């Protein structure tokens, strides 16, 4: 019987081992318990699965197993044949010769004879390995039909013993390849694993599939035999070793077997895997989290299943409580994939994900730091109200000093979002030299818009609406940032960067000390040039009756509004006011009063209000026929617009005849100041009652990466988290950047 030959095989191997000094690897089991193909990168090489889950050595006795005379004769002939081959090819492999050679060895020394004998011994060892390999394969192949029959036996004891034998065979390479070549046996193993209630049988069968999964042929055999649903079922086992074998085998299938991901999803594998995040074995968790990443990447439904089963909370808990680098890295990969899902993002943030990820920004592992940075970048647009981010903000400011492009991209983008509409964060970043660090990042970035644009947006946030805003405005000047910032207005820079730069210049102009440096940098001609170009483009679409298109996500009307608003603030300085007037801008400003966009009407009336302080400019405004649209704007629902219009009308009526002035006065009183006497004083002094720029958020940007591009890392869906009104001067949120998921490594 072939099974008897398998039982006697260890005896024969022992005899062979006594005849030479090199271990064949069969008797000792060296390198037979191989970790998962993928887990070789996840688990330490010196701590393979055998040390984590110890398999019991099972000795199968021959009692009760019938053995006829033919079997004995076959066994004797096989043994004699192998012995004759060895004696013919390697006569020195006998036990006596080997012992004589060993007897000549002196501890700690190698004789010349031994050195001369080494090549011969190596050759003998290789030949013995070959003989062992061939015998294992031949013996296993002959035993396969009988083992398959025993696995299908109705007696559970017989099935268990058969599973133990197959498990031992699966640990040897030659016999393992024979097993993979038998679809009937693999199917029997899968069936046994799925139907058994015996823990030892479950352990042996999962171990068999685990060993087969280290070869592509084995993966295919498992897949074709319906092994995936059975392995998913084993994820509910109470036995740790069974869990390990099942998750590792599934991991190898997910990595290398086509169709495995869909099969795992259909078998409800995610629903079984997410609860495993509560286990406390770091290496087991590392494989589990990598399975989640492979399943979630590029599949929105999988991301939602992970969310529904409490995945974000479990993943954040791992990032918070563990220090094993490979586990932290694989977990950060999953969070990175989930961080572009609009549903998962708030859940991760609410679970404390920002703080947990921030803990690892100072790690010695570059790949972990990079994953944490990207994930923080992706989550930051929904974390603007989060507390406890002080240490994260400080680390991000420090990260601005590095030269790595990815680090700078993530750090600037995250700072841009976390300083959006958050006065506390703005103040903290400003007080920790954030302005200086951002300026230096811009200077080093060159033409890399992925760094420059978020850095400019962050500076725009820091220079407005918080207690240290004036300090930030001055800091830009003191760190020689104004010339570099003004240069960003030049084409062919991308429109999002130009738009952000215009808003920053507007904020810098709020500080009187910045007016002279801005003028020296020739900011006014550049703003006027951009204004004219953007207005012409917008008018062409109006004339053609087409909707205003977006250029790189920016409408030309936004550029018109931004440039006019910046010129409005700059016009508070007499020298700037004169330069703006000499550039023949008044006809354009008057034309903008007819715009259908309320914000454009407001900033146009505002800049005319400043220019009208000079008599020559006031006369030019009147000559352009501004009175009619200004009278209409007195009835505007926007108080700022109405106030500016009243101030301009009041100024240009000063030199008119008494009848005209009386008519203007009556109109002002009836339309604007009937219930607000203070507004009349404001109009007379041309001081706006309210800050004209609302604290609206910019529309969000593109996601960092998308699940629909090649793997390592992320999801390329447009990640819009709100339809916010566009305002050039407002704080703007930045969603994740698009990036291929293969960057996840």
UniProtKB/Swiss-Prot annotation:
Keyword Manganese: no
Gene Ontology terms: cellular component: adherens junction; catenin complex; cell-cell junction; cornified envelope; cytosol; desmosome; gamma-catenin-TCF7L2 complex; intercalated disc
Interaction with DSC1: region residues: 574-661
Protein name (database record): Junction plakoglobin
Membrane topology: Peripheral membrane protein
Entry keyword set: Acetylation, Cell adhesion, Cell junction, Cell membrane, Cytoplasm, Cytoskeleton, Glycoprotein, Membrane, Nucleus, Phosphoprotein, Repeat
Family stated for the protein in its record: Belongs to the beta-catenin family.
Subunit structure: Homodimer. Component of an E-cadherin/catenin adhesion complex composed of at least E-cadherin/CDH1 and gamma-catenin/JUP, and possibly alpha-catenin/CTNNA1; the complex is located to adherens junctions. The stable association of CTNNA1 is controversial as CTNNA1 was shown not to bind to F-actin when assembled in the complex. Interacts with MUC1. Interacts with CAV1. Interacts with PTPRJ. Interacts with DSG1. Interacts with DSC1 and DSC2. Interacts with PKP2. Interacts with PKP3 (via N-terminus); the interaction is required for PKP3 localization to desmosome cell-cell junctions.
Function: Common junctional plaque protein. The membrane-associated plaques are architectural elements in an important strategic position to influence the arrangement and function of both the cytoskeleton and the cells within the tissue. The presence of plakoglobin in both the desmosomes and in the intermediate junctions suggests that it plays a central role in the structure and function of submembranous plaques. Acts as a substrate for VE-PTP and is required by it to stimulate VE-cadherin function in endothelial cells.
Organism: Mus musculus (Mouse)
């Amino acid at each position: 019987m072939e099974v008897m030959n398998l039982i006697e095989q260890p005896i024969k191997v022992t005899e062979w081992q006594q005849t030479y000094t090199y271990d064949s690897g069969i008797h000792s089991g060296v390198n037979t318990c191989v970790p998962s193909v993928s887990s070789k990168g996840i688990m330490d090489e010196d701590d393979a699965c055998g040390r984590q889950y110890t398999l019991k050595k099972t000795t199968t006795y021959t009692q009760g197993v019938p053995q006829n005379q033919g079997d004995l004769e076959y066994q004797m002939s096989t043994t004699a044949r192998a012995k004759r081959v060895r004696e013919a090819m390697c006569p020195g492999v006998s036990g006596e010769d080997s012992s004589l050679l060993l007897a000549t060895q002196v501890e700690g020394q190698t004789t010349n004879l031994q050195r001369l004998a080494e090549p011969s011994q190596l050759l003998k060892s290789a030949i013995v390995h070959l003989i062992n390999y061939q015998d294992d394969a031949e013996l296993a192949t002959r035993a396969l039909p009988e083992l398959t029959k025993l696995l299908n036996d109705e007696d559970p004891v017989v099935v268990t013993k058969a599973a133990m034998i197959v498990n031992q065979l699966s640990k040897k390479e030659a016999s393992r390849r024979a097993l993979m070549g038998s679809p009937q046996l693999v199917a029997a193993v899968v069936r046994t694993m799925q139907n058994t209630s015996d823990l030892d049988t479950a352990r042996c069968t999962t171990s068999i599939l685990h060993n087969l999964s280290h070869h592509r042929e084995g993966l295919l055999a498992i897949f074709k035999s319906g092994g995936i649903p059975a392995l998913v079922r084993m994820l509910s086992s109470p036995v740790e070793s069974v869990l390990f074998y099942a998750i590792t085998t599934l991991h190898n299938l997910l990595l290398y077997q086509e169709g495995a991901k869909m099969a795992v999803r259909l078998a409800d594998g995610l629903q079984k895997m997410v609860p495993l995040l509560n286990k406390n074995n770091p290496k087991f968790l590392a494989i589990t989290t990598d399975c989640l990443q492979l399943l979630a990447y590029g599949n929105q439904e999988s991301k939602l299943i992970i969310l529904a089963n409490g995945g974000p909370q479990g993943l954040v808990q791992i990032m918070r409580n563990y220090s094993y680098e490979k586990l932290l890295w694989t977990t950060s990969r999953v969070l990175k994939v989930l961080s572009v899902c609009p549903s998962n993002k708030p859940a991760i943030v609410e679970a404390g994900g920002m703080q947990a990820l921030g803990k690892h920004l100072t790690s010695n592992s570059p790949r972990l730091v990079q994953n944490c940075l990207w994930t923080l970048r992706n989550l930051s647009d929904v974390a603007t109200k989060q507390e406890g981010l002080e240490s994260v903000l400080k680390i991000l400011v420090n990260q601005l000093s590095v030269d790595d492009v990815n680090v700078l991209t993530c750090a600037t983008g995250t700072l841009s979002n976390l300083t959006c509409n958050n006065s506390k964060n703005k103040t903290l970043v400003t007080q920790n030299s954030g302005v200086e660090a951002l300026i230096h990042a811009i200077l080093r970035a060159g033409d890399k818009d992925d760094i420059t644009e978020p850095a400019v947006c962050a500076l725009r946030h820091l220079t407005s609406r918080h207690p240290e805003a004036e300090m930030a405005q001055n800091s830009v000047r003191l760190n020689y940032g104004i010339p570099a910032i003004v240069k960003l207005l030049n084409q062919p820079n991308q429109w999002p960067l130009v738009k952000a730069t215009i808003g920053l210049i507007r904020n810098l102009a709020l500080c009187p000390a910045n007016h002279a440096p801005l003028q020296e940098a020739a900011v006014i001609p550049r703003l006027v040039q951009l204004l004219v170009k953007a207005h012409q483009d917008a008018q062409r679409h109006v004339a053609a009756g087409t909707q205003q298109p977006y250029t790189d996500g920016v409408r030309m009307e936004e550029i018109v509004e931004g440039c006019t608003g910046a010129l409005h603030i700059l016009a508070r300085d007499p020298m700037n006011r004169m330069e703006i007037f000499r550039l023949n801008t008044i006809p354009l400003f008057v034309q903008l009063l007819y715009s259908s966009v309320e914000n454009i009407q407001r900033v146009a009336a505002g800049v005319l209000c400043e220019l009208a302080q000079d008599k020559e400019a006031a006369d030019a405004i009147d000559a352009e026929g501004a009175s009619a649209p200004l009278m209409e704007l007195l009835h505007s629902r926007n108080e700022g617009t109405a106030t500016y219009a009243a101030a301009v009308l009041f100024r240009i009526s000063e030199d008119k005849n008494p009848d005209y002035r009386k008519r203007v006065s009556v109109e002002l009183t009836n339309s604007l100041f009937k219930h607000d006497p203070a507004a009349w004083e404001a109009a007379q002094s041309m001081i706006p009652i309210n800050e004209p720029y609302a604290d609206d958020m910019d529309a969000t940007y593109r996601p960092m990466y998308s699940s629909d591009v090649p793997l390592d890392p992320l999801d390329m869906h447009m990640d819009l988290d709100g339809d916010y009104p566009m305002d050039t001067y407002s704080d703007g949120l930045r969603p994740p950047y698009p990036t291929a998921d293969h960057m996840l490594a």
